[in-house]
């Protein structure tokens, strides 16, 4: 109960600070030429489903279905809710399109202007998941959470920065770097290789079965 109260306090602070930003947009008459995007990276479990925090499978709705509010002064639409499937990778493409900047060919996100203007359907399935854990797909009605066939099979980190993310953060150790290979198959690196580094799964990833939910 104490931690829930602390989290509620954090949300209240975020709400107040967001309100201050919106008040400034009112004060300086900025709505007519300012795009506003409010988004976050993940939700947070507060004991729902018997779980806590975020980075472990399954990615329930409380973690995966994140808020996204967009004001586009070019359309002026407000108070509209859309069921179009969008992802955070769409935001950079949306910003580039807004400023009439060419979207790089290797960028896999889809600009959201069509969604904002007339609820355009831009994808049939949205993908999300956790490194070394479940790979999930949803069409908005169902979500399929595919677990690895072999939880003990080797996994690799693909990067140009030899840093470990999540769990024990910091530089990847010398012994791990001895096993690196160059990997050329990433579509978003402009034909440049990245390091393929053997790594370990995080204990928090768990070993859950493949699941299917009707949302």
Which residues make up each language-model segment?
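A structural signal for well-ordered alpha-helical segments within the folded catalytic domains
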Residues: 5-8, 12-19, 63-64, 86-93, ...
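A long, amphipathic alpha-helix that forms part
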Residues: 1-34, 98
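Histidine-centered active-site microenvironments of extracellular/periplasmic hydrolases
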Residues: 24-80, 84-87, 106-108, 123-124
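Short glycine/proline-rich turn/loop motifs
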Residues: 1-6, 71-77, 215
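Short loop segments at secondary-structure junctions
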Residues: 16, 72-75, 100-102, 140-142, ...
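Polar, surface-exposed loop/tail segments
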Residues: 32-34, 79-139
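C-terminal, low-complexity/hydrophilic appendages and adjacent surface loops
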Residues: 60-61, 131-215
